[in-house]
């Protein structure tokens, strides 16, 4: 069984923000036998799903399908969260707190932090990094999080005052699930992106010694890392392997020790091969985002028709060999926010009636699904196309592009439908970003006053009852306005062999290389 780490008791802690110093439990590799204390030395080969275009943290993604292994190795973290309890554990930061309900925060840093070029990692460095991510011209995937900040003010070397555009007492989670958590040397960034790619500078547990593009990255231990005796490893080799089957085969054959994983199919094969698997607990999931800014999905009937036309269990079989987790509700039953409110209804007869009604009005549902070339993404788009081909008055084309071409299309909102995700732990940081009309991360473009009001209420609610009532309305409105077809829970996971230990993930499947160590 794929190892899921969320329990009902732990999930109850997510109702309100808890700030503390206790971390998530570390877990081992393929074996659950005790392995003793961490051992320094040795090297590990790890796999990430997607190679970065640049090493500038503004261009990276801090999640399991992005470059979390790379970012955490090179830059370290300001803070992390425990996916089980959602407690915040401070790292290079020592405090991030609000005294006025999330209107302002004070970020405190450890004194004496330095980048590997000898320059200080101070409040000014955080200020400059966050300004860059908030610049729309940077095209950062973390713009939705950074854009919530109105201003930052350097108080002293270790103190940064953060003023929010709107109150958000849950903003710590927008740091842990984004590249706001990764701070690069401003002096190195000022030399330009090409120079930074050749010689990136962070304050993380490892430094980059070589980048063979389309192949691998080599890292060595940073002897001046702030959290001695970590890191335990002397070196890391980071490979880029986009295919899930190949990732499993490499671990099973001894070609790698750990891999970030996105695929339910690959996770099932990994367990069959005797490998270890760890899955970060999430609700929500991946969805077909219908662009409500333009036809045909500016008409809610078109959105409902497509939603009701699709058989999600068949998509699971075709795309994931039946191993995926099709979400029936926004929150899993273990969540304190769970309500038995269905995300979708398969109703082919009503779908065809709506397709016919729209066609009679001169508005047939013709659209293009923008997909990446990742195998499962492309397969999901193609099986969706095949299902809709069984209906009259609807036509779906598939356009598959590589990730470098996908990003500018996403930023420009130049698509009819594409795959997006809202993977829910602390609900505010995900749901507000994904579906609030003011959010720069609202890929569907949905604008619904009742949904907005509920998302705002969930963000600022001060009691479990207030937040629960708000997110019940959110669940109802997402069902009613239908901006998305939720087709699978995400699989933010790692696969491991039995000789690597100290595996810990924060937020959306972001592994922490500083804590890993090897035996054998």
Protein language model features and the residues they cover:
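N-terminal lobe/hinge region of extracytoplasmic solute-binding protein
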Residues: 47-98, 131, 201, 510
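Long beta-strand-rich cores associated with HINT superfamily self-processing modules
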Residues: 494-520
């Amino acid at each position: 069984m794929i190892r899921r780490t969320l329990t009902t008791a732990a999930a109850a802690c997510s109702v309100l923000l808890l700030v503390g110093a206790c971390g998530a439990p570390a877990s081992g590799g393929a074996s659950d036998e005790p392995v003793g204390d961490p051992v320094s030395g040795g090297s590990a080969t790890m796999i990430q799903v997607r190679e970065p275009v640049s090493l500038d943290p503004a261009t990276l993604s801090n999640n399991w399908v992005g470059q979390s292994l790379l970012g955490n190795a090179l830059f370290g973290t300001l803070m992390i969260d425990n996916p089980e309890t959602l407690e915040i554990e401070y790292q290079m930061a020592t405090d991030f707190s609000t005294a006025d309900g999330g209107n302002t925060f004070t970020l405190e840093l450890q004194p004496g932090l330095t980048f590997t070029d000898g320059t200080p990692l101070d409040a000014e460095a955080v200020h400059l990094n966050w300004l860059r991510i908030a610049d729309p011209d940077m095209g950062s995937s973390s713009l939705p999080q950074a854009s919530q900040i109105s201003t930052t003010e350097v108080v002293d070397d270790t103190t940064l005052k953060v003023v929010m555009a709107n109150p958000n007492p849950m903003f710590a989670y927008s740091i842990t699930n984004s590249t706001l958590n990764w701070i690069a040397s401003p002096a190195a960034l000022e030399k330009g992106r090409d120079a930074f790619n050749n010689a990136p500078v962070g304050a993380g547990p490892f430094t980059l010694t070589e980048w063979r593009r389309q192949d691998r990255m080599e890292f060595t231990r940073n002897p001046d890392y702030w959290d001695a005796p970590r890191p335990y490893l002397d070196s890391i080799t980071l490979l880029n392997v986009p295919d899930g089957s190949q990732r499993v085969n490499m671990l099973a054959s001894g070609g790698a020790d750990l891999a970030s994983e996105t695929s339910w199919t690959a996770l099932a094969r990994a367990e069959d091969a005797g490998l270890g698997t760890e899955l970060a607990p999430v609700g929500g999931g991946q969805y077909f985002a219908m662009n409500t800014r333009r036809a045909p999905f500016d008409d809610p009937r078109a959105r409902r028709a497509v939603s009701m036309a699709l058989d999600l269990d068949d998509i699971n079989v075709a795309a994931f060999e039946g191993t995926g987790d099709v979400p029936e509700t926004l929150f899993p039953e273990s969540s304190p926010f769970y309500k038995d409110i269905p995300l979708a209804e398969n109703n082919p007869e009503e779908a065809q009636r709506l397709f016919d009604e729209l066609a009679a009005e001169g508005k047939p549902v013709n659209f293009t699904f923008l997909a990446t070339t990742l195998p499962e993404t492309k397969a999901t788009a193609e099986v969706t196309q095949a299902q809709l081909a069984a209906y009259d008055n609807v036509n779906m084309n598939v356009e598959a592009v590589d990730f470098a071409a996908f990003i500018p299309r996403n930023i420009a909102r130049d698509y009819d439908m594409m795959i997006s995700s809202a993977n829910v732990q602390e609900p505010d940081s995900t749901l507000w970003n994904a579906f609030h009309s003011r959010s720069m991360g609202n890929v569907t473009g949905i604008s619904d006053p009742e949904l907005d009001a509920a998302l705002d209420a969930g963000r600022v609610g001060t009691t479990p009852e207030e937040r629960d009532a708000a997110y019940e309305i959110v669940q109802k409105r997402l069902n009613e306005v239908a901006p998305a077809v939720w087709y699978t829970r995400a699989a933010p996971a790692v696969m491991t062999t039995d000789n690597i230990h100290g595996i810990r993930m924060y937020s959306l499947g972001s592994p922490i290389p500083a804590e890993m160590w090897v035996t054998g």
